A protein has these predicted regions:
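Signal-peptide-cleavage-adjacent N-terminal segments of secreted and extracellular proteins
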Residues: 2-79, 112, 136-140, 144, ...
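N-terminal cap/lid subdomain of alpha/beta-hydrolase-fold enzymes
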Residues: 5, 66-155, 166
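Short, functional N-terminal and low-complexity linear motifs
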Residues: 30-32, 125-128, 158-162
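Phosphate/oxyanion-binding active-site loops and adjacent basic polyanion-contact surfaces
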Residues: 57-61, 146-158, 183-186
């Protein structure tokens, strides 16, 4: 019950912070995170971005994200945050590459092909590698890997979302959904 109350509090804080003004222009930070093309990627009609967001400078903790925008009307589509379960399963290696992402990896591992069931046809998908130590997310403090838990993971995710929304303010007023599987629901 306490965990649920804390999560509701964090979500209310996040909603309050996201109620400030937004801009539709691509920022310098966004441009730096733009993926022009992945190795072996087919031609696509949507934009992709990836990068790191620092969630704790003192410990050197940063979370990795990959945003795949919708190929049709991305400015009118909602934002969906995807979290894999586990805990400890990579959202990029599994959720994006094996389930709902725009690409599949061919059997030889030499190229990508389009996933005809990709969820980014209906929403802009934000894949988050969480907690630090999972996938491409990292910490420079080894003890963080031993002391990670639900509360710190939730706090880091909130810090990530607040900072990410500052980097991508055009998503502040969109419908926002959180989806995942297994332990991601915790």
């Amino acid at each position: 019950m306490m965990r649920m109350a804390a999560m509701l509090f964090y979500m209310m804080v996040f909603a309050t912070i996201c109620s400030s003004s937004s801009s539709m222009a691509i920022t310098r930070e966004q441009e730096e995170d733009r993926i022009r093309e992945l190795p072996g990627q087919p031609r696509v009609g949507f934009s992709q971005f990836s990068g790191y967001v620092s969630v704790n400078k003192k410990h050197g903790r940063a979370l990795f994200y990959w945003l795949t925008q919708s190929p049709s009307s991305p400015n009118n589509k909602p934002l969906l945050l995807w979290l894999n379960g586990g805990p400890g399963c990579s959202s990029v290696a599994y959720g994006a590459s094996e389930e709902i992402g725009p690409f599949r990896i061919n059997k030889t591992g030499s190229s990508l092909y389009l996933n005809r069931f990709a969820w980014n046809t209906e929403a802009n998908i934000l894949f988050l590698e969480s907690p630090a130590g999972v996938g491409f997310s990292y910490t420079n403090t080894s003890s963080d890997l031993l002391t990670s838990g639900d509360n710190r993971t939730a706090q880091d995710a909130l810090i990530f979302l607040v900072k990410w929304m500052s980097r991508f303010p055009q998503y502040k007023y969109r419908d926002f959904y959180i989806a995942g599987e297994s332990y991601a629901g915790t």
